[in-house]
Amino acid sequence: MAFVTRCLILAAGRFDPVTLARAALSDREPRLDVFELACALSADVLDFQDVDAARSPLVRATHRALGPSAALALLGAERAARYDAILTTGEDIGIPLAARLRLVRDRPSHTMIAHTLFPVKKRIFFSVGRVDGCIDRFLCYATSEERNLVERLSVPAGRVQRIAYHADQRFFRPFEAPPEPDLICSAGQLLRDYPTLIEAVRGAPIRLRIAAGSPWIAADLKPGTPLPSNVEWGKYSRFDLRALYARSAVCVVPIQENDYQTGISTILEMMAMGKCVIATRTRGQTDTLVDGVNGIYVPPGDPAALRAAIVRALDRPEETARIGAAARRYIEENATLDLFVERVAAATLGSPAKDEAPRLAQ
């Protein structure tokens, strides 16, 4: 009889699988990676809803004192004996789980997706708590994070794997209708540099639509100053956001300088739509776009450079279309949701991912 690996996924968030599946089937929402992974691994999933429903006094106390991520880690640790492998979707869950697994003699394997371990409050768990001893595989999305893990946190390189993040290539896909030639758009919330983008289009014959929001951030992001007449700011559903991408001649992702791969979800969604993406090249955002090939990079906080890049892209629609087509090819070859699921599932089961993210920008 073949051995079956019993897997558990600990996922940040509150998910309704039935509603999300219906929305994806009706082409109203992209597929959710957590549930695609659960299907691929035949895994159980615990999320914040399970924390809310937990009867364990310790889990409830942890939730009150430290928040839902730490409580979810504790809930996973309480059930660890039922599983051979655990996947945590971020260090907010993975670090406290690893700390708790240090007390378990016969623990399951633990694969953790590491988003950003640069902050001191996270690094201290490696230097003092040595939680890395209970994390068998680290998956990261950026070269900056890969180097941080190996060079700064002293995690053995063989336990660190950089993979491409993803967009659902079925939902985010090129539309046949031509874009509106004077329309550009931007989207997202975390560490966005919208003031620089707004200044870049001020007074220009360009319409800018900003979809300021994130599925993972509850608080609304509001403009800090009055907007020029050619700029509109609002929140969009995923369905309406896709329509905005499709209508736009160029897509822009302005980012504040940082070490994290901020904006990658938005960039990949736009690329999957076959769009020419202009993005800020930060310390953490270096791995996906190849300047002039499948996207355009601009320096941080430079409205003049950003304006020049936007105007050039709008004035040269054939070049913009070429870059957009290359962007879609990049997604299909490297960053689809299906490839992401294959890689993460393989890592969780203890084997190397089939096609590690290519280091195109190096």
Q: Can you say where each PLM-predicted feature lies in the sequence?
A:
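Conserved donor-binding/catalytic core segment of Leloir-type glycosyltransferases
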Residues: 176-192, 197-209
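Conserved acidic donor-binding segment of nucleotide-sugar-dependent glycosyltransferases
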Residues: 291-292, 296-303, 312-318
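Conserved donor-binding/catalytic loop of nucleotide-activated donor transferases
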Residues: 246-248, 266-276, 280-281, 291, ...
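Nucleotide-activated donor-binding/catalytic signature segment of Leloir-type glycosyltransferases, i.e.
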Residues: 212, 219-245
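Acidic donor-binding loop of glycosyltransferase active sites
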Residues: 245-260, 275
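Nucleotide-sugar-dependent
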Residues: 253-269, 281-287
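Acidic anion/phosphate-binding donor-loop and adjacent secondary structure
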Residues: 122-123, 147-151, 166-181, 195, ...
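A short, well-ordered alpha-helix in the C-terminal region of glycosyltransferases
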Residues: 312, 319-333, 340-346
